Amino acid sequence: MGQKSNPNGLRLGIIRTWESKWYDVDKKVPFLVGEDFKIRTLIKNHYPKSTISQIEIKRLKKSNDEFIEIDLYTSKIGIIQGPENKNKNSLINKIEKLINKKVQINIFEVKAINKIAVLVAQNIAMQLQQRAFYKAVLKSAIQKALKSGIKGIKIIITGRLGGAEKARRDSISMGVVPLNTLRADIDYAFEEAHTTYGVLGVKVIINHGEVLPNKTIADTRQIFSSQYENKKNNNKRHFVDKKNFKKNTS
């Protein structure tokens, strides 16, 4: 029943890896998992939405001191760093006070923002909170995602749509979204939009294609460069001088 399970968790250990990369004694694991959860919630509350797509936490040990390395994947490096790295340094101070450990933050830029389910869901939720019409928001999000070179997308929205008295569910899908195919690179995200007439739930499911043998998710997603932009640049018309054109045709 792949449609009733989280597509991200269903593919862990098959084509996806864990976002918390560390190993420790069994007694410490519950405490460290809770610590990771606190770090993630603090980072999400520190920055506005539609900025961070992924948070990776690595735990290292130097001598007897534990050292935490955090990788942030974002579409807006300027907001994350701030002027003279003020936002980044303030975040490091908050995390170090929370867990009493040394922290290092690495920031990586993501360019193809319309291919990442988390950023798409956050963008939709933000527009719904600004009282935009939900059907127009969903259609524009799907068009932008398809232009970026994905194989398929499905968006599900639930709640009091358009301020209706009765809550209902609406969905739009384009392309192929095989949830039961474990080798398919499915990116899933859920966000909540807090509006004046209630909370709306937004689910985004994006299919990046199949992960073939000897390949990884990075090969299918190509989040650092858009396939659509490369095709668009190749299809540009090249104007030739009339004199040279006449000489070539004769």
From Swiss-Prot:
It comes from the Bacteria. The keyword ATP-binding does not apply. Residues 39-111 form the KH type-2 domain. It holds the Pfam family Ribosomal_S3_C. Transmembrane segments: none annotated. One of its GO terms (cellular component) is cytosolic small ribosomal subunit. The keyword Nucleotide-binding does not apply. Keywords: Ribonucleoprotein, Ribosomal protein, RNA-binding, rRNA-binding. GO terms for biological process: translation. GO terms for molecular function: mRNA binding; rRNA binding; structural constituent of ribosome. Binds the lower part of the 30S subunit head. Binds mRNA in the 70S ribosome, positioning it for translation. Belongs to the universal ribosomal protein uS3 family. Part of the 30S ribosomal subunit. Forms a tight complex with proteins S10 and S14. NCBIfam families: rpsC_bact (TIGR01009). This is Small ribosomal subunit protein uS3. It comes from Rubus stunt phytoplasma. The lineage of its organism: Bacteria, Bacillati, Mycoplasmatota, Mollicutes, Acholeplasmatales.
